[in-house]
């Protein structure tokens, strides 16, 4: 048995070989011939093995219980792992090593959890770093450089705090002067001649000044939080560097690495449980916010129809599978081939965008954007302070105050000039790169939306086939059982939920430059925007005046549009209040619902087959040529009568906010003239009984990207229907042409005279695509199982104004005016056919019940396929296309899985969301379709009806064997099909019905015992352990940064939970008391709206799925960038992202202001209440104090940085981590939010109290579900005491 001293130990005597590498570099040119001679000797040594040399005398070989060889020295009575013959075959030092060699005494080993590590048998130690590389010294230098840059960034934040504090001083002084004037005005109110100012104007100015002071205080609080966050991150980085440098060799041994790894897993479990608590709290806040919004609705609107009263009238039965025999198969498969081609192009576009983003990441320095943002914000703050000083009246000021104000102005102007010169030379290129990156991100998001839409459509096509996509057929679904034992880079440092949306620095810089140019040109007068006046609703003498009014009965569509919005979002006028809630230009637009299926209460059902069938029929019509009609139809332009001619009931329901443009309703010469602007429309007639008309409402929601179509009612449809209407029903069907993805239909009614449908649907479509389409509404009658189109309405969306909503009557063009219009027999859209479809789906199908597990089933299915080879060509081609759809991976399947296994659990979670539909070869699809339409089928004397192309020849057009070959109907693609498509052939000599054509043919053995119907040469399972987990080296500094990042995330997660619980209690109390002030804050506060928008349950599943796709795309971009790193070389960008993670601002939870929770006092009475508080600001030496603070700002920052440098370079006192017992609830602990006061310094205001917030221990249970209950804390964690917390002496910030 070997001695334990040879195994991995925790001795502090480590060999540090790094000092040998510089010597090798210095002597490389001097001893070049010596290195060549050593290489020749090394080549000679490599040819010699241990077996070529005998063991020395007194040595013996033995094996341990695990099979590892060790050696016994009988002379010294010792055991060792080292072969005594290594002195003949291995180099002695690192200088003698060539290539990837290790010297004598060193060994490379592998651990399944931590990866490769190295053993020094001579020093009896282990370490994580590769002794042949100098990556550790490069990391230390990068960390030191970043800390210097972060110190500059912190000084910019402190200077910004000083400038904003000076602005607060001036604002407070102005507020005090206004209060004094208001009090004097109130005392002299009895005599108007003694009052110099209007009391009402003074009160209004006082309120504005008060709001300004309140806003500046809030901004000071935000800056204080930023300073505290940055200081905490910097102190964490300082402590990590000190901890690594404190070790003798600067490396962790294998035992410490394993302990850190276990601790990271514990913290990760606590993070998972804490995120569940946070999500539950945010969902509760969404509910409370909605309740507060409902309380804000006035009583006069209480009688309006609620947007939630609408019930989805979409079809609840899947009618696709039972109508395959009666549908136009040609149009359907042609559309499928076109969709597949588009899907392939979008996939290529996504890969290209990912590659471009991976290239852009290398061009942008991590953390540089935040520094540029702080510089630009500092410039803006100085500009605002300069404007405040310029607006001060100097009449009542003393000479000393005037001199100080002039000096301050001059100093600010010089600072701004220098800052602009520096920014123009340094920041321009970085901002250009950032702007390009943002553009690529927007394109990537749009590409993902379009690709997901095509995926849903392909999934709809595949659902019509006899094959069903099972959840177990996805690749990798059987290998997810093992628990992931390692945390990757993306698991730790990519957390989109915890990071606020980035600020558009480009727009910020442009605005700052405009302000500077205005100041340089002395254009300080305010620019008032031109107010757009609303159009008058009066009737003019022009015939076109009727186009500016509508005949709109009150439609539920106008209220359903805001079913998932706040009451403020229902306001469509571009007011200032709406501008506050509108997302800024730099933020990504909200995810657009990909499909209309179950997206909202009024959503439609994706009856794609009905719409495609309708398009196929309409393509046969000659709509472009003029029709010689015996009776000319009326003008299709939707004219509106004068208000004098309208009935009283319609006059009372008219609206003044209508569309000013007309919409074509049918095809005629008058409609073309009307659209061109030449035709002067005559006075519109009132709806007459002999005309068939349909009332349609249209509204476009820009934020959601949804067109709301309201099919309200119809009038006199009997004019279109000549048969008896006793046993018939009528319904409306609508679709956006051309290339419609969805069709919508209303419920069927038996009333042909005045049917009232009142059905509202939402069609997700972008605005640019909407303006190129036409809305076609078809009137369909249903008699039993026979359906017939009796009329149609065509509305050009090019004339639709998306800024306004319309509700109009449209004339219906009868189908008898079109000679080639055929009746449509669509049993799938009737209720009787729905029942028949359900009965047919429940009937047993002998062909589909068979399985491929036996040879008998294969023989039987081959006989069936041979007899029915030339029958039902469309269904066979449908099965073929469905099989191809199943044979490809999903959209978000990672391309490179050789280095990271971190996506396995996420793929398992997304298996229910992401459809298992992929890319198909468009050329083979079209060729198969043409061959099917020609009724040409190959007879290869086999029982295979589908020839799967191999992976390498997907894009090549095959001239031979391209015709679809029928195969067994019982064959179902297995999980392996999702990666490699293959040709299914019958090898009669071996009785294999589906053999891979890509593998080498095996030798035939007659009478073999194994089953030959099984797949030959199945793919071997992936090995559990890989020898090289990643080719990028990892050091102890990386490991310590990962651990501290996890602890930082846990700390801020607990802080967020405490703030969310406090906010929930306050809002819930205000909701119960119906407090209007708190309700107004919850609805109008932008920060709170952004917070609750992350967890709004009203989001459709497609939006959540798109967010997951974006997250996976970010991980794929990281993998693409990592593949560019040469093997063995460090990843510099990833390490920079690690260290910038600590100073990156996380998710901010807004705090409810105390002014909104208490009743607001009278401004004059409040003067007495705040008299003591404002004594500091009533000093006549305010201007001198401001100038003194401005001059001393830079000196104080220098002193602070020197103190911080001395504190971090010297001995730092360490204290044990605070332990919070589970009895302390988050609600009882005060929130650790530093409150900034105007008189406070940044050093004092940045002091945080982390001990006051509840702490989630790494041993917390992951199944914590209660939102109000604190996460349990472990009491016995001896390993956690190893990670100390450092307290900065100057600022008191605990790390």
From Swiss-Prot:
GO terms for cellular component: apicomedial cortex; cell-cell junction; cytoplasmic side of apical plasma membrane; Kibra-Ex-Mer complex. Residues 53-86, 100-133 form the WW domain. Residues 1-59, 540-559, 840-871, 889-911, 941-971, 1153-1176, 1247-1278 are annotated as: Disordered. GO terms for biological process: border follicle cell migration; negative regulation of glial cell proliferation; negative regulation of organ growth; positive regulation of apoptotic process; positive regulation of hippo signaling; R8 cell development; R8 cell fate specification; regulation of DNA-templated transcription. InterPro entries: C2_dom, C2_domain_sf, C2_WWC, WW_dom, WW_dom_sf, WWC/KIBRA_Hippo_Reg. Residues 200-228, 334-460, 1048-1075 form a coiled coil. Residues 895-909, 1163-1176 have a biased composition (Acidic residues). Keywords: Cell membrane, Coiled coil, Cytoplasm, Membrane, Phosphoprotein, Repeat, Transcription, Transcription regulation. Its main location: cytoplasm. Residues 690-810 form the C2 domain. GO terms for molecular function: kinase binding; molecular adaptor activity. Residues 941-965 have a biased composition (Basic and acidic residues). Residues 856-868, 1247-1274 have a biased composition (Low complexity). Regulator of the Hippo/SWH (Sav/Wts/Hpo) signaling pathway, a signaling pathway that plays a pivotal role in organ size control and tumor suppression by restricting proliferation and promoting apoptosis. The core of this pathway is composed of a kinase cascade wherein Hippo (Hpo), in complex with its regulatory protein Salvador (Sav), phosphorylates and activates Warts (Wts) in complex with its regulatory protein Mats, which in turn phosphorylates and inactivates the Yorkie (Yki) oncoprotein. Kibra acts synergistically along with Ex and Mer to regulate the Hippo signaling pathway. Forms a complex with Mer and Ex. Interacts (via domain WW 1) with Ex (via RXPPXY motif). Interacts with Mer, Sav, Hpo and Wts. Belongs to the WWC family. KIBRA subfamily. This is Protein kibra. It comes from Drosophila sechellia (Fruit fly). The gene is Kibra.
């Amino acid at each position: 048995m070997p001695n334990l001293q040879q195994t991995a130990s925790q001795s502090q005597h480590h060999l540090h070989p790094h000092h040998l590498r510089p010597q090798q570099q210095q002597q490389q040119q001097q001893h070049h011939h010596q290195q060549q001679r050593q290489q020749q000797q090394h080549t000679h040594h490599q040819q010699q093995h241990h077996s070529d040399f005998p063991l020395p005398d007194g040595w013996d070989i033995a094996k341990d219980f695990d099979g590892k060889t060790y050696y016994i020295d009988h002379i010294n009575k010792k055991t060792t792992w080292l072969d005594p013959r290594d002195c003949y075959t291995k180099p002695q030092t690192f200088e003698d090593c060539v290539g990837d060699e290790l010297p004598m005494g060193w060994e490379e080993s592998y651990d399944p959890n931590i990866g490769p590590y190295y053993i020094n048998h001579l020093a009896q130690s282990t370490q994580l770093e590769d002794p042949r590389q100098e990556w550790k010294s490069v990391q230390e230098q990068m960390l030191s450089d970043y800390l210097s840059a972060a110190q500059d960034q912190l000084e910019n934040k402190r200077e910004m705090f000083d400038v904003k504090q000076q602005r607060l001083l001036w604002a407070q002084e102005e507020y005090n002067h206004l209060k004094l004037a208001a009090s004097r005005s109130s005392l002299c109110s009895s005599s108007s001649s003694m009052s110099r100012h209007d009391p009402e104007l003074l009160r209004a100015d006082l309120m504005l000044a008060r709001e300004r002071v309140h806003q500046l205080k809030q901004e000071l609080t935000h800056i204080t939080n930023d300073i505290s966050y940055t200081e905490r991150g910097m102190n964490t980085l300082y402590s990590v560097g000190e901890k690594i440098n404190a070790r003798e060799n600067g490396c962790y041994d294998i035992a410490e690495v394993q302990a850190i790894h276990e601790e990271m897993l514990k913290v990760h479990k606590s993070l998972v449980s804490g995120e569940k608590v946070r999500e539950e709290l945010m969902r509760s806040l969404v509910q409370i916010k909605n309740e507060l919004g409902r309380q804000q609705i006035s009583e006069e609107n209480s009688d309006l129809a609620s947007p939630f009263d609408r019930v989805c009238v979409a079809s609840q039965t899947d009618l696709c599978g039972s109508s395959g025999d009666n549908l136009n198969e040609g149009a359907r498969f042609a559309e499928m081939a076109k969709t597949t081609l588009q899907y392939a192009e979008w996939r290529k576009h996504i890969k290209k965008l990912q590659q471009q983003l991976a290239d852009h990441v290398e061009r942008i320095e991590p953390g540089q954007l935040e520094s540029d943002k702080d510089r630009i914000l500092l410039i803006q703050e100085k500009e605002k302070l300069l404007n405040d000083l310029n607006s001060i009246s100097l009449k009542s000021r003393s000479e000393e105050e005037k001199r100080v104000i002039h000096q301050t102005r001059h100093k600010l102007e010089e600072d701004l000039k220098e800052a602009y010169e520096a920014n123009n030379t340094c920041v321009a290129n970085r901002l250009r790169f950032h702007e390009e990156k943002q553009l690529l991100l927007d394109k990537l998001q749009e590409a993902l939306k379009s690709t997901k839409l095509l995926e849903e459509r392909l999934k709809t096509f595949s659902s019509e086939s006899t094959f069903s996509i099972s959840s177990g057929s996805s690749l990798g679904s059987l290998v997810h059982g093992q628990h992931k034992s390692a945390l990757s880079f993306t698991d730790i440092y990519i957390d989109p939920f915890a990071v606020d949306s980035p600020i558009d620095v480009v727009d910020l810089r442009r605005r700052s430059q405009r302000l500077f140019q205005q100041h340089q040109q002395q254009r300080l007068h305010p620019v008032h925007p031109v107010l757009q006046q609303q159009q008058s609703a009066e009737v003019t003498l022009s015939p076109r005046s009727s186009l500016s009014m509508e005949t709109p009965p009150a439609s539920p569509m106008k209220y359903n549009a805001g079913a998932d919005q706040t009451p403020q979002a229902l306001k469509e006028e571009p007011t200032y209040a709406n501008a506050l809630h509108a997302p800024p230009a730099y933020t990504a637009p909200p995810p657009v619902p990909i499909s209309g299926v179950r997206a909202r209460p009024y959503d439609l059902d994706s009856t794609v087959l009905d719409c495609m069938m309708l398009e196929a029929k309409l393509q046969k019509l000659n709509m472009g040529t003029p029709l010689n009609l015996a009776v000319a139809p009326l003008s299709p332009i939707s004219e509106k009568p004068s208000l004098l001619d309208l009935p009283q009931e319609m006059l009372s329901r008219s609206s003044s906010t209508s569309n000013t443009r007309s919409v074509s309703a049918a095809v005629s010469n008058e409609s073309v003239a009307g659209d061109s602007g030449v035709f002067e429309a005559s006075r519109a007639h009132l709806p007459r009984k002999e005309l068939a008309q349909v009332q349609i409402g249209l509204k476009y929601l820009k934020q959601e990207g949804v067109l709301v179509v309201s099919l309200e009612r119809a009038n006199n449809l009997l004019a279109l229907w000549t048969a008896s209407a006793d046993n018939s029903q009528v319904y409306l069907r609508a679709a956006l042409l051309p290339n419609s993805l969805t069709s919508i239909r209303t419920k069927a009614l038996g009333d042909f005279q005045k049917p009232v449908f009142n059905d509202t649907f939402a069609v997700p479509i972008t605005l640019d695509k909407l303006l190129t389409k036409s809305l076609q509404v078809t009137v369909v009658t249903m008699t039993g199982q026979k359906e017939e189109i009796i009329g149609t309405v065509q509305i050009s969306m090019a004339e639709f104004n998306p800024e306004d909503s319309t509700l109009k009557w449209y004339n219906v063009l009868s189908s008898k005016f079109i000679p080639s219009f055929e009746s449509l027999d669509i049993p799938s859209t009737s209720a009787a056919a729905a029942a028949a479809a359900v009965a047919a789906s429940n009937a047993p199908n002998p062909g589909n019940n068979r399985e491929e597990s036996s040879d008998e089933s294969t023989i039987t299915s081959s006989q069936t396929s041979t007899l029915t080879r030339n029958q039902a060509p469309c269904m066979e081609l449908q099965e073929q296309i469905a099989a191809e759809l199943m044979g490809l991976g999903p959209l978000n399947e990672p391309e490179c899985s050789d280095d990271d296994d971190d996506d396995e659990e996420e793929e398992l979670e997304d298996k229910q969301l992401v459809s298992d539909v992929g890319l198909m070869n468009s050329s083979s699809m079209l060729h198969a379709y043409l061959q099917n339409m020609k009724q040409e089928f190959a007879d290869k004397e086999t029982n295979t009806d589908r020839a799967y192309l191999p992976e390498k020849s997907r894009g090549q057009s095959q001239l031979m064997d391209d015709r679809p070959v029928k195969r067994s109907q019982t064959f179902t693609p297995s999980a392996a099909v999702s990666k490699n498509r293959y040709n299914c052939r019958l090898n009669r000599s071996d009785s294999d019905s589906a053999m891979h054509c890509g593998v080498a043919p095996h030798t035939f053995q007659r009478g073999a015992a194994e089953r030959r119907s099984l797949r030959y040469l199945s793919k071997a399972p992936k090995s559990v352990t890989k020898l090289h987990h990643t080719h990028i080296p990892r050091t102890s500094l990386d490991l310590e940064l990962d651990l501290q990042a996890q602890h930082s995330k846990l700390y801020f997660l607990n802080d967020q939970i405490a703030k969310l619980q406090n906010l929930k209690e306050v809002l819930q109390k205000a909701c119960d008391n119906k407090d209007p002030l708190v309700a107004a804050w919850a609805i109008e506060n932008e920060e709170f709206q952004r917070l609750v928008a992350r967890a709004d349950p009203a989001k459709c599943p497609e939006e959540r799925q798109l967010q997951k796709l974006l997250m996976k795309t970010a991980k794929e971009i990281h993998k693409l960038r990592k593949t560019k790193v040469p093997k063995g070389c460090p990843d510099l960008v990833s390490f920079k992202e690690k260290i910038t993670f600590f100073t990156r601002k996380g998710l901010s939870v807004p705090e409810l202001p105390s002014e909104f929770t208490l009743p607001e006092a009278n401004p004059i009475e409040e003067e007495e209440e705040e008299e003591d508080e404002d004594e500091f600001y009533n000093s006549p030496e305010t201007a001198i104090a401001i100038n003194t603070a401005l001059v001393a700002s830079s000196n104080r920052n220098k002193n602070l940085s020197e103190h911080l440098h001395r504190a971090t370079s010297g001995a730092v006192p360490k204290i044990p981590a605070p332990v919070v017992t589970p009895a302390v609830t988050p609600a009882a602990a005060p929130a650790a939010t530093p409150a900034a006061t105007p008189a406070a310094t940044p050093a004092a205001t940045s002091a945080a109290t982390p001990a006051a917030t509840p702490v989630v221990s790494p041993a917390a249970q992951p199944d914590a579900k209660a939102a109000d209950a604190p996460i349990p804390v472990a009491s016995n964690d001896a390993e956690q005491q190893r990670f100390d917390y450092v307290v900065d002496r100057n600022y008191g910030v605990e790390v």
